[in-house]
Amino acid sequence: MSNVTHQPKIGFVSLGCPKNLVDSERILTELRTEGYDVVPRYDDADMVIVNTCGFIDSAVQESLEAIGEALNENGKVIVTGCLGAKEDQIREVHPKVLEITGPHSYEQVLQHVHHYVPKPKHNPFLSLVPEQGVKLTPRHYAYLKISEGCNHRCTFCIIPSMRGDLVSRPIGDVLSEAKRLVDAGVKEILVISQDTSAYGVDVKHRTGFHNGEPVKTSMVSLCEQLSKLGVWTRLHYVYPYPHVDDVIPLMAEGKILPYLDIPLQHASPRILKLMKRPGSVDRQLARIKQWREICPELTLRSTFIVGFPGETEEDFQMLLDFLKEARLDRVGCFKYSPVEGAGANELPDQVPEEVKEERWNRFMQLQQQISAERLQEKVGREILVIVDEVDEEGAIGRSMADAPEIDGAVYLNGETNVKPGDIVRVKVENADEYDLWGSRV
C-alpha cells in the first residue's frame, strides 16, 4: 500500500529591498521544512503568498499589481510585508485577498497557510532543506539581517510605522547564522538592517554569547567576530554615528571589506533639518577625509534625495558642492516622491516635477563624471574580484568596491575557467562611469 500523499504547493512573489528578501527566505525555509513544495508558476500552486513593499508610491503600485496578478492567475492569495501594514488600502483594491499580515509576521503567515492548505504528513529528518535555509540569492553570497525596525523618524520615510522601532537580533543568533552560511559555501556576507550602526542600542549593547564566549551586542563587535569567518563582509545602511569611526581600522586591516554604504540624503543643513536627519556637512567632509587617510582603499556609497519640499536652487547647489568635495565612489539619487503617511507631505513649497527632473539630471551628470574619474584611477592596478556569472564569452564579477545589483561590475572577457564564488586577482585594463574590464593575473 502506498504512503504517497499530495505535496501541497505554494507560489511565492517577493518584492522590495534586501531586508524583504530575507523575510521571504525565512518564510520559504519554514514552508520547506514543513514539507510544502515551492513552485514558480501560479497555476501549479495551491496558494500564493505575496511579500509586498510599501516604501514609495511606485512600490505600492507594483505590490498592488502583483497581488492582482496572483488573484487573477490563482485566486487564493495571502499578502504580507510592508504594504500589509495598510490592510484597508489593499482591501479597497483587492477585497478577495484571503489574509493580510504586516512585515516580519512569519508565524501569522504560516498559520494562515496551515488554515487554507493544511500541512502535509512530513518527516523533518528526511527534509531536503539545507542547514542554512532557503536562499533567494546565488549560493556564494547572502544577506544577513541583524535587526528590524528603526528609531529614526525621517519625514520622507514611513518604515517605522510599518516595521516598528529598532529590535536587534541576539548577537549569538546572528553569528550562528553567519557560520551556517559560510559552512554552506557563502563567500560574501552582506550585513543589512534599517539602521546597521544602531545595532544593539535597544538592548543597551548588552553582552551576548557565541560558542560560550561573551560578545558585546554592537556593530563593531559584530564586525570583529564576522572577520574571523574568513569571507568578505560588506556593511550596508550605516548611519554616520560617531562610532562608525571605529570600524574604519578594521577595514584598513583587511578584516572586513573597505566599503561603507551611508545614506546621507542631502547636504543642505536646512533641508536635512526638514528631513529630521542628523548631519553637519563640514563635519561629514572632515570625517570622510579622515576615513580615507586611515583606509585609502575605502569605497563610499551613498543615496540622496533631490526635489525635497522646500529645496531651493541654493540648497541644491550645496548638494552639488558637497559631491564635488566628497568625491563619493558610488551614489544613488531619487527624485522626492510623496509617500502616504510621511510627514514631508505636509511641508510647504513642494517642488514642481519638472524642477525635480532637471535637478536629478544635473546631479547624475556630475556624479557620473566623478565616478568615471574614480574608476579611471584603478586602470593598471590589480584588484580582487568575486565571480558572479560565467558563460561562453567570459565571466562577470564584482570588486570589493561593488555590492550586488546596486553597484558596478568587473568584466573578464574570455575568462571561462572560473566558477561563481571564485575570488580571483585581476589587472584592470579599462573603465567607464560604472564598470571595469580586466584580465586574470
From Swiss-Prot:
All copies of the MTTase N-terminal domain together span 8-118
- UniProt: [4Fe-4S] cluster 1 binding residues: 17, 53, 82
Enzyme Commission (EC) number: 2.8.4.4
Predominantly, its location class is cytoplasm
Gene Ontology molecular function terms on file = 4 iron, 4 sulfur cluster binding; aspartic acid methylthiotransferase activity; metal ion binding; protein methylthiotransferase activity
Binding locations of [4Fe-4S] cluster 2: 150, 154, 157
Secretion signal, residue range per the UniProt entry: none
Classification via InterPro entries: Elp3/MiaA/NifB-like_rSAM (IPR006638), Methylthiotransferase (IPR005839), Methylthiotransferase_CS (IPR020612), Methylthiotransferase_N (IPR013848), Methylthiotransferase_N_sf (IPR038135), NA-bd_OB-fold (IPR012340), Ribosomal_uS12_MeSTrfase_RimO (IPR005840), rSAM (IPR007197)
Q: Which cofactor does it need?
A: [4Fe-4S] cluster
- Keyword terms, alphabetized: 4Fe-4S, Cytoplasm, Iron, Iron-sulfur, Metal-binding, S-adenosyl-L-methionine, Transferase
The UniProt record lists the TRAM domain at 376-441
Top-level EC class, please?
transferase
* Cofactor: how bound: Binds 2 [4Fe-4S] clusters. One cluster is coordinated with 3 cysteines and an exchangeable S-adenosyl-L-methionine.
Localization terms from the record: Cytoplasm
Spell out the reaction equation it catalyses: L-aspartate(89)-[ribosomal protein uS12]-hydrogen + (sulfur carrier)-SH + AH2 + 2 S-adenosyl-L-methionine = 3-methylsulfanyl-L-aspartate(89)-[ribosomal protein uS12]-hydrogen + (sulfur carrier)-H + 5'-deoxyadenosine + L-methionine + A + S-adenosyl-L-homocysteine + 2 H(+)
NCBIfam families from the entry? 30S ribosomal protein S12 methylthiotransferase RimO (TIGR01125), MiaB/RimO family radical SAM methylthiotransferase (TIGR00089)
Family statement drawn from the similarity comment of this UniProt entry: Belongs to the methylthiotransferase family. RimO subfamily.
Q: What does this protein do?
A: Catalyzes the methylthiolation of an aspartic acid residue of ribosomal protein uS12.
What is this protein's record name?
A: Ribosomal protein uS12 methylthiotransferase RimO
What does UniProt list as this organism's lineage? Bacteria, Pseudomonadati, Pseudomonadota, Gammaproteobacteria, Enterobacterales
Question: Which gene name belongs to this protein?
Answer: rimO
